[in-house]
Amino acid sequence: MCKADAIELNTYALATDKRQTSAEMEQQLLDLVAAVTAAVKVPVAVKLSQWFTSLPHLVGQLEEAGARGVVLFNRFYQPDFDIETLEVRPTLHFSKPSELLPRLHWAAILYGHVNLDVAITGGVHSPKTC
Protein backbone atom coordinates (compact mmCIF):
# COMPACT_ATOMS: atom_id res chain seq x y z
CA MET A 1 0.00 0.00 0.00
CA CYS A 2 1.32 3.44 -0.94
CA LYS A 3 1.23 6.30 1.50
CA ALA A 4 1.45 9.90 0.36
CA ASP A 5 3.19 12.52 2.46
CA ALA A 6 1.20 15.32 0.82
CA ILE A 7 -1.07 16.07 -2.12
CA GLU A 8 -0.64 18.80 -4.71
CA LEU A 9 -3.85 19.85 -6.43
CA ASN A 10 -2.94 20.94 -9.94
CA THR A 11 -6.17 22.60 -11.05
CA TYR A 12 -7.18 24.46 -14.15
CA ALA A 13 -10.48 26.04 -15.07
CA LEU A 14 -11.08 27.78 -18.37
CA ALA A 15 -13.60 30.61 -18.19
CA THR A 16 -15.93 30.11 -21.14
CA ASP A 17 -19.25 31.24 -19.69
CA LYS A 18 -19.60 35.04 -19.74
CA ARG A 19 -22.16 34.83 -16.94
CA GLN A 20 -19.74 33.16 -14.52
CA THR A 21 -17.89 35.67 -12.36
CA SER A 22 -14.31 35.40 -11.21
CA ALA A 23 -15.62 35.13 -7.64
CA GLU A 24 -17.68 32.08 -8.65
CA MET A 25 -14.65 30.47 -10.26
CA GLU A 26 -12.55 31.10 -7.16
CA GLN A 27 -15.34 29.69 -4.98
CA GLN A 28 -15.27 26.46 -7.00
CA LEU A 29 -11.56 26.17 -6.24
CA LEU A 30 -12.14 26.89 -2.54
CA ASP A 31 -14.93 24.31 -2.38
CA LEU A 32 -12.65 21.73 -3.99
CA VAL A 33 -9.85 22.44 -1.54
CA ALA A 34 -12.22 22.26 1.44
CA ALA A 35 -13.62 18.92 0.22
CA VAL A 36 -10.19 17.40 -0.39
CA THR A 37 -8.69 18.60 2.90
CA ALA A 38 -11.71 17.25 4.78
CA ALA A 39 -11.30 13.85 3.11
CA VAL A 40 -7.56 13.29 3.60
CA LYS A 41 -5.14 13.32 6.51
CA VAL A 42 -2.08 14.59 4.65
CA PRO A 43 -1.26 18.23 3.89
CA VAL A 44 -2.71 19.64 0.67
CA ALA A 45 -0.93 22.20 -1.52
CA VAL A 46 -2.60 24.00 -4.41
CA LYS A 47 -0.73 24.84 -7.61
CA LEU A 48 -2.02 28.18 -8.84
CA SER A 49 -2.15 30.11 -12.06
CA GLN A 50 -0.65 33.60 -12.00
CA TRP A 51 -3.81 35.03 -13.54
CA PHE A 52 -5.96 35.44 -10.43
CA THR A 53 -7.17 38.98 -9.79
CA SER A 54 -6.08 39.22 -6.15
CA LEU A 55 -3.58 36.48 -5.47
CA PRO A 56 -2.86 37.40 -1.81
CA HIS A 57 -6.58 37.38 -1.01
CA LEU A 58 -7.11 34.05 -2.75
CA VAL A 59 -4.15 32.48 -0.95
CA GLY A 60 -5.63 33.63 2.37
CA GLN A 61 -8.93 32.03 1.42
CA LEU A 62 -7.17 28.80 0.41
CA GLU A 63 -5.53 28.76 3.83
CA GLU A 64 -8.95 29.16 5.48
CA ALA A 65 -10.27 26.31 3.27
CA GLY A 66 -7.57 24.02 4.66
CA ALA A 67 -4.67 24.25 2.23
CA ARG A 68 -1.25 23.96 3.83
CA GLY A 69 0.70 25.27 0.87
CA VAL A 70 0.59 26.95 -2.52
CA VAL A 71 2.81 26.39 -5.55
CA LEU A 72 3.60 29.32 -7.84
CA PHE A 73 2.83 28.98 -10.77
CA ASN A 74 1.14 26.43 -12.97
CA ARG A 75 2.34 26.26 -16.59
CA PHE A 76 -0.43 25.34 -18.96
CA TYR A 77 0.32 23.09 -21.86
CA GLN A 78 -0.99 24.67 -25.02
CA PRO A 79 -1.49 22.20 -27.83
CA ASP A 80 -1.18 23.30 -31.42
CA PHE A 81 -3.77 22.66 -34.10
CA ASP A 82 -2.78 21.39 -37.53
CA ILE A 83 -5.08 23.14 -40.02
CA GLU A 84 -4.22 20.70 -42.79
CA THR A 85 -5.07 17.51 -40.90
CA LEU A 86 -7.54 19.16 -38.49
CA GLU A 87 -5.86 17.39 -35.60
CA VAL A 88 -4.55 18.60 -32.29
CA ARG A 89 -0.78 18.31 -31.97
CA PRO A 90 0.58 18.12 -28.45
CA THR A 91 3.47 20.47 -27.83
CA LEU A 92 5.65 20.77 -24.77
CA HIS A 93 7.47 23.99 -24.00
CA PHE A 94 9.83 23.87 -21.06
CA SER A 95 10.16 26.78 -18.67
CA LYS A 96 12.70 29.53 -19.27
CA PRO A 97 14.86 31.35 -16.74
CA SER A 98 12.83 34.52 -17.43
CA GLU A 99 9.81 32.83 -15.81
CA LEU A 100 11.47 32.83 -12.39
CA LEU A 101 11.16 36.55 -11.63
CA PRO A 102 7.33 36.74 -11.39
CA ARG A 103 7.35 33.66 -9.15
CA LEU A 104 9.92 35.21 -6.83
CA HIS A 105 7.98 38.48 -6.88
CA TRP A 106 4.77 36.82 -5.69
CA ALA A 107 6.54 34.61 -3.16
CA ALA A 108 8.06 37.77 -1.65
CA ILE A 109 4.66 39.49 -1.54
CA LEU A 110 3.09 36.49 0.21
CA TYR A 111 5.98 35.99 2.66
CA GLY A 112 4.97 36.94 6.18
CA HIS A 113 1.33 37.49 5.24
CA VAL A 114 0.17 33.87 5.10
CA ASN A 115 0.70 30.92 7.40
CA LEU A 116 1.16 28.28 4.76
CA ASP A 117 4.11 27.03 2.75
CA VAL A 118 4.91 28.81 -0.50
CA ALA A 119 6.80 26.91 -3.21
CA ILE A 120 7.99 28.02 -6.63
CA THR A 121 8.08 25.84 -9.72
CA GLY A 122 9.64 26.63 -13.07
CA GLY A 123 12.31 29.01 -14.25
CA VAL A 124 15.27 27.58 -12.31
CA HIS A 125 17.73 25.96 -14.68
CA SER A 126 21.01 26.22 -12.78
CA PRO A 127 22.35 27.45 -9.43
CA LYS A 128 23.26 30.71 -11.18
CA THR A 129 19.60 31.35 -12.07
CA CYS A 130 18.90 32.38 -8.49
Label for each model-derived stretch:
Residues 1-121, 125-130:
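Alpha/beta enzyme core
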